[in-house]
């Protein structure tokens, strides 16, 4: 005789509510990675656990528009809006990369109302390491 097929999605297997618990984070670190093609903003707590993140691509910008300052400003605003709701008041800012969105993202962070402890440029600089790629001929 055939065994009865267990029902998938029965009530006892379904989790109610959100899996993430709403933490109160008074202090955090905002990482801005600005490349020429995109800007990624990640907000972590002081231990480095990611609380919120956003990028110009997830904000709806596609192609070359992802590298623009306006796209970086929108991405920073989206990432910070989520953590302000969780109670973040103070933050440190780490900016990495040579992209156009560096200053625009920092301006959006300053306007959000979060007190900034410091702003640090953590762009990796080689001490004459790897050979750079050849120059483009257009």
UniProtKB/Swiss-Prot annotation:
Assigned keywords, A-Z: Chloroplast, Plastid, Ribonucleoprotein, Ribosomal protein, RNA-binding, rRNA-binding
Single GO cellular component term: ribosome
Assembly with partners or alone: Part of the 30S ribosomal subunit.
Keyword set includes Disulfide bond: no
Region named Disordered: 1-25
Organism the protein comes from: Carica papaya (Papaya)
A Gene Ontology BP annotation from the UniProt entry: translation
InterPro entries: Ribosomal_uS11, Ribosomal_uS11_bac-type, Ribosomal_uS11_CS, Ribosomal_uS11_sf
Biased composition (Basic residues): 9-25
Pfam families registered for this protein in UniProt: Ribosomal_S11
Record's subcellular location: Plastid, Chloroplast
Keyword Transferase found: no
Main location, first listed in the record: plastid
Protein name: Small ribosomal subunit protein uS11c
Family from the record: Belongs to the universal ribosomal protein uS11 family.
A GO MF term: rRNA binding
